[in-house]
C-alpha cells in the first residue's frame, strides 16, 4: 500500500473505515464503511472525490458500525466493487450490482485470491456470521484488518 488513512473508527466505537492508496497512484481501496448513529456526524470522514476513486470496498462484517454507510457512500460517488461474504451482504441488506462474493469453504482456511493488482487473503473472524478478516497486499506493501475478532467463535 502506498498510503493509509483511518477515516473513522480509530479510538471510537463506530464509523469503522480505512482508506488505502494502492497500485496505481491516486486509486484507492477501502475496508469497512460504518456509521455512528449516536453522533451528529454519523459517517466516516471520506470525501466524494475519494469515493469516486475507490476501486474496491471490502466489508469485514454486517454490523452497522462496519457496513452501515454503504448506501450513503454510493450516493456520494462510490461506484467501485464491493467484496464481502454472501452472509455479510445479505445481513447488511445491501443491494448493489458490482460485487465480488468471497467464497467461504468450510474445508479450507484461510482463502487467497487475486483481484487485479491486489492479493487478498481472508479468513473467518468468529465475531458474527459471515465475518472475515483481510490481509491485503500489493507491490508496495501489505496491511491486515481483523474487523471485530472473537476468540470463542459465535459463528
Labelled PLM ranges:
Residues 1-58, 63-155:
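His/Asp/Glu-rich metal-coordinating catalytic cores
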Amino acid at each position: 500500500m502506498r498510503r493509509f488513512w483511518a477515516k473513522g473508527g480509530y479510538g471510537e466505537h463506530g464509523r469503522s473505515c480505512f482508506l488505502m492508496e494502492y497500485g496505481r497512484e491516486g486509486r484507492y481501496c477501502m475496508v469497512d464503511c460504518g456509521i455512528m448513529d449516536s453522533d451528529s456526524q454519523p459517517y466516516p470522514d471520506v470525501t466524494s472525490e475519494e469515493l469516486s476513486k475507490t476501486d474496491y470496498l471490502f466489508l469485514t462484517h454486517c454490523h452497522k458500525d462496519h457496513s452501515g454507510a454503504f448506501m450513503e457512500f454510493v450516493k456520494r460517488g462510490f461506484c467501485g466493487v464491493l467484496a464481502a461474504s454472501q452472509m455479510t451482504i445479505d445481513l447488511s441488506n445491501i443491494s448493489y450490482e458490482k460485487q465480488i462474493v468471497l467464497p467461504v469453504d468450510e474445508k479450507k482456511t484461510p482463502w487467497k485470491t487475486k483481484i487485479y493488482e491486489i492479493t487478498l487473503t481472508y479468513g473467518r473472524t468468529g465475531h458474527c456470521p459471515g465475518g472475515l478478516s483481510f490481509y491485503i497486499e500489493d507491490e508496495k506493501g501489505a496491511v491486515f484488518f481483523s474487523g471485530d475478532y472473537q476468540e470463542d467463535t459465535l459463528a
